[in-house]
């Protein structure tokens, strides 16, 4: 099994799929031909925006853009960049249209200490060539099922809908994005307004059938991923384990999950 180890300070992204009335729309060859030309190889707009604040995508960072520092960390390829400007409690009103209510509240609650440096946009994402080749070869094959709650005709590839026609397809692009197997240790915290917090230390493993050399993909065509989480701290939660098998079509084969409480 190929593994990618990372150490994260915070993490977490929860997605909720809501059923909607969606219909499969077949891509034309002309649309597929846009991949790698007017669109990036995975379907994003290649050109920059009219305002000039988002640049053209030119391939992303090269594999040797940052030198390895050890312990799975790499040097910052943008270390020399300086902020274009800094948003503070004194000037946030002029940027209000681009700020969330939560960010505005932070400026108002902590006017002396909360600042938001803004850097130029960099389109640094790049994937292996085999990912681009696979996305183009399978474009138009995947189909939404069960009102968008699942997909079919998708055999453990990446970016199921590179030219999405609905919000549900965009969500499935996120769910099927290119990822390596992961073994990571990270911490979660929910700070109170007075600054106090309790750290929850977690260890997680995530495996994808197409990235697991000891798995026969043909025996599990509906499997999206395998997930295992162990709580290491605090003591009252230490030893708790969560195991999940997620599927592409959860009506055909519902999620399987097990919890062990120490």
Model-derived features: positions:
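Well-ordered beta-sheet/strand-loop patches within structured domains
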Residues: 258-262
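Solvent-exposed N-terminal domain segments of exported/luminal and surface proteins
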Residues: 29-253
């Amino acid at each position: 099994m190929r593994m990618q180890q990372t150490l994260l300070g915070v993490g977490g992204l929860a997605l909720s799929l809501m059923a909607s009335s969606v219909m499969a729309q077949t891509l034309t060859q002309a649309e597929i031909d846009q991949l790698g030309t007017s669109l990036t190889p995975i379907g994003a707009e290649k050109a920059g925006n009219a305002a000039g604040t988002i640049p053209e995508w030119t391939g992303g960072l090269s594999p040797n853009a940052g030198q390895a520092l050890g312990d799975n960390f790499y040097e910052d390829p943008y270390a020399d960049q300086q902020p274009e400007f800094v948003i503070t409690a004194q000037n946030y009103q002029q940027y209000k249209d681009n700020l969330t209510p939560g960010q505005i509240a932070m400026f108002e609650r902590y006017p002396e200490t909360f600042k938001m440096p803004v850097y130029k946009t960099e389109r640094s994402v790049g994937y292996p060539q085999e990912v681009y080749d696979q996305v183009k070869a399978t474009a138009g094959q995947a189909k939404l099922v069960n009102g968008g709650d699942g997909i079919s005709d998708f055999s453990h590839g990446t970016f199921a809908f590179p030219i999405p026609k609905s919000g549900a397809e965009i969500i499935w692009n996120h769910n099927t994005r290119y990822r390596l197997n992961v073994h990571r240790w990270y911490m979660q915290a929910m700070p109170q307004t007075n600054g106090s917090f309790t750290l929850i230390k977690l260890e997680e493993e995530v495996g994808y059938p197409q990235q697991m050399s000891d798995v026969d993909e043909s025996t599990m065509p509906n499997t999206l991923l395998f997930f295992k989480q162990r709580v290491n701290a605090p003591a009252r939660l230490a030893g708790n384990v969560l195991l999940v098998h997620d599927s592409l079509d959860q009506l055909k084969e519902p999620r399987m999950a097990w919890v062990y409480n120490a």
